[in-house]
Each structure stands twice: as structure tokens, then as C-alpha cells.
Amino acid sequence: MNIHEYQGKEVLRKYGVAVPEGKVAFTADEAVKAAEALSSSVYVVKAQIHAGGRGKAGGVKIAKSKEEVKAYAEELLGKTLVTHQTGPDGQQIKRLLIEEGCDIKKEYYVGLVLDRATSRIVLMASEEGGTEIEEVAEKTPEKIVKEVIDPAVGLQSYQARKIAFAINIPKELVGQAVKFMMGLYKAFTEKDCSIAEINPLVVTGDGKVMALDAKLNFDSNALYRQKDILEYRDLDEEDPKEIEASKYDLSYISLDGNIGCMVNGAGLAMSTMDIIKHYGGEPANFLDVGGGATAEKVTEAFKIILSDQNVKGIFVNIFGGIMKCDVIAEGVVEATKQVGLTLPLVVRLEGTNVDLGKKILDDSGLNITSAESMADGAQKIVSLVK
């Protein structure tokens, strides 16, 4: 689950991580009141959306008066901001962070991520702050330093000091930087984060180390024990189809193609998308119905897939282990009737009760194309949507 920058800073502040003073605003008048509450003569007006690249897209403004704060707020609120992370449709700005301006002396990058190679949390940092860390990793990977953290003991202060010296934090501020990183790690672990990025971490002219920006993502599987974090959820920033899918315990991610996919199991779902692309098609979604799908779940999955206007055909690829093929077949038939499906539909069933499942499809009298294998199914749906 993603949260807004200002919410991330609220979380970090509780762990002793230094952040600029700021307030959220939903209207231009609220923006002015927020500026009046800050003891600063320079203000930063920042669009709050769940995407990076806001600065380059014009979503971050520097105001030198409260009149400018109001003008920028009126300009940004309601505007659709398009960044490299939003996609071409962009995201509408519905709230702003009004923050005190900082005298920035130097920018750095600090982040915590889960590293699959080591199965541990890794602290990453770079002297190249303020730019996309992916660009740094691609062009100058030697400028990124890492510390692998032992989960038995957690981040140690000597590791944080090592990082601080490696990215050339001024010696007199290393103590502050260590405190910053230790607090960031504590927030990461206690709040079940999957990513915590500070870009940039800044050293200010008056000798402070603070987070100028903060990106925190959380493990959705752990939200049952993070009620305070769950309250930060902003449904306006999420895909309506993904919200609807979550109501039925369906794992759905919207993509840019035109072939809707309904599969059981994340691995099979990814393989299905790969083989569709292999045969020249483009998947419209990732949709995992899980191991305990019912006819109702299958029907809702169809409705969600068809709510995407780009979908020109559907490929159902099921391997029945815990899930029975006849149950899926009944769900497919019921869903096809309920939604009045007119698009091409290819179904591949394999596993438990597969013969019964195929018989249900054949006896339905519906225009359903059966496939004998995943490759056969992918080829058929790709040819049908062309």
C-alpha cells in the first residue's frame, strides 16, 4: 500500500527522523492558513499524488509570499499531473503539502529495500541525491553504497556511520545522519514497510540533516496489524478495478494490453502473460483468482476484466489442484451468461475434475473456445483478437 509524502513524514517524525515543518491543504484557503502557521518566509507547495517525478512535471513550486502560495495552490488543485510514473492519463491533484523552505547545501539519497538476493533488508545510499536512483544505478552504479542488515540484530550504528562517511556527509553531521538512518530503519521494520526512500536527504545551511521527500510503501499482507497505517489509505489514488477486486480477495493489476487474463496462482498468471506476449499479444491485466475461487468470484473477476474498455478478448487459464476445474467451468458459464459476453473467450483447464469441467463448457451452448494447453490457448486468443 502506498501513502502520500506528508503521511510518510508524519510516520517518520514519530521515529525521530528530521523532516521540514509542513501542513496538508485541500483548498487554496487552507494552503494560505498552512503557510501562516509556518515560521518561514519561503514556502514549498507540493502536489500530493502516489507517484514520483512531481518536480519535473511541475508539481512542486517555490513560493516567496503567502500570495504566491495561494496562486500556486489554485493552479495545482484539480490539475491532472502527468509524470513518468503516472502513465499518460496522469493523476488529479486533490491535496497539497505546504512546507517551510530549506537552505539546501547538499542532496543525498538514502533508502531501505528488501533484497531478494540476500533475503534481507538493505540500506542503500548515494551522494547523487535528487535524481532518480534507477538512473544512478544504471549509469554510475559505483556511486551507490549498500549495507546488508542482519535481521537478528538489526541495523547497527557502525553500519550507519560507514554509510554516512561513504557518501561524504560532513564529519560534524555524521552523528545526525546516523540518528536519521537508525530512526528510518526502526520505522521500516516496526511498520512493515516494503520500501522507504528518502530522496533527497539534505544537509542544510544551518547544519541539519533532514528528509526533504519521503516515499513509504507498506506490505499489504501486514495491514491487519497496522491499523494506523491503513487509515492513511487514499482510494482516490488507486485503480477502481483494483479496489473492486480486493473486495473479493482477487489479486488484480491493470496493464496496457487488450487480452484479459483470469488465472489461478501468481506464477501461472505471470507465465500466462509471458506466453501471450510470446505469441504477439498484449495482456490487459494480471488477475489471480487464488486457490479457493467460487462461481461468484469467477463472475466478479469477469466483470472486473470487462470494465476495462481496452479488453478485446479473455483467456482463462486454470490448473486445478485445490481448485476444481468443474467449479471454474460453472463459474465461467454463469459469468458469461450474466455479463452477456460477446468478446472471444478461450478457456484452458487442466487438473482436478478436468473432464467434468470441459463437459460443462461443451454442454453450455455458449461460444467458448477450448484449449488443450497454455500455448494453444495463447495462440488462439491472440489470433481471435487480431
From Swiss-Prot:
Positions contributing to Mg(2+) binding: N199, D213
EC number: 6.2.1.5
Gene Ontology terms describing biological process: succinyl-CoA metabolic process; tricarboxylic acid cycle
Superkingdom of source: Bacteria
Pathway: Carbohydrate metabolism; tricarboxylic acid cycle; succinate from succinyl-CoA (ligase route): step 1/1
Span of domain ATP-grasp: 9-244
Record flagged with keyword Nucleotide-binding: yes
Keywords assigned by UniProt, alphabetized: ATP-binding, Ligase, Magnesium, Metal-binding, Nucleotide-binding, Tricarboxylic acid cycle
Cofactors, names only: Mg(2+)
Binding site for substrate: N264, G321, I322, M323
Top enzyme class: ligase
Catalytic activity reported: succinate + ATP + CoA = succinyl-CoA + ADP + phosphate; GTP + succinate + CoA = succinyl-CoA + GDP + phosphate
Disulfide topology: none
Family assignment from sequence similarity: Belongs to the succinate/malate CoA ligase beta subunit family.
Subunit composition and interactions: Heterotetramer of two alpha and two beta subunits.
Protein name in the entry: Succinate--CoA ligase [ADP-forming] subunit beta
Lineage: Bacteria, Bacillati, Bacillota, Bacilli, Bacillales
Encoding gene per record: sucC
